[in-house]
Amino acid sequence: MTMTDPIADFLTRLRNANSAYHDQVKAPHSKLKANIAEILKREGYIADYRTEDAQVGKTLVVDLKYGPSRERSLAGVRRVSKPGLRVYAKSTNLPKVLGGLGVAIISTSQGLLTDKQAAKQGVGGEVLAYVW
């Protein structure tokens, strides 16, 4: 069976592994998922990520991050634009997640950017996910 929304699958794997206090999560690799992981690492939601060569294809391994007393650094993830309903935002109308405490991941013509980076560069695009 084919996967209709690989980004939602990746975000769900992150959410479930984080809720179960796993140290790492594995997902099928793609450039888009690696870019999402790079944004999450840069914003401090995950510890690290790497690509491993498997027998069939590549695997993206994400090391999750927790606080000193095992509190989650990734409180929530929500997929916004879906294959059945795409959501776009102009550069003047970019979404704020929890009043600026969270991050919106936006696919732009300059690549994947956070809402703050997109506003600074003056570009809009497809709103992929909210992370807080």
Swiss-Prot record:
GO terms for cellular component: ribonucleoprotein complex; ribosome. InterPro entries: Ribosomal_uS8 (IPR000630), Ribosomal_uS8_CS (IPR047863), Ribosomal_uS8_sf (IPR035987). It comes from the Bacteria. The keyword Transmembrane does not apply. Transmembrane segments: none annotated. One of its GO terms (molecular function) is rRNA binding. The keyword Ribosomal protein applies. One of the primary rRNA binding proteins, it binds directly to 16S rRNA central domain where it helps coordinate assembly of the platform of the 30S subunit. NCBIfam families: PRK00136.1. Belongs to the universal ribosomal protein uS8 family. This is Small ribosomal subunit protein uS8.
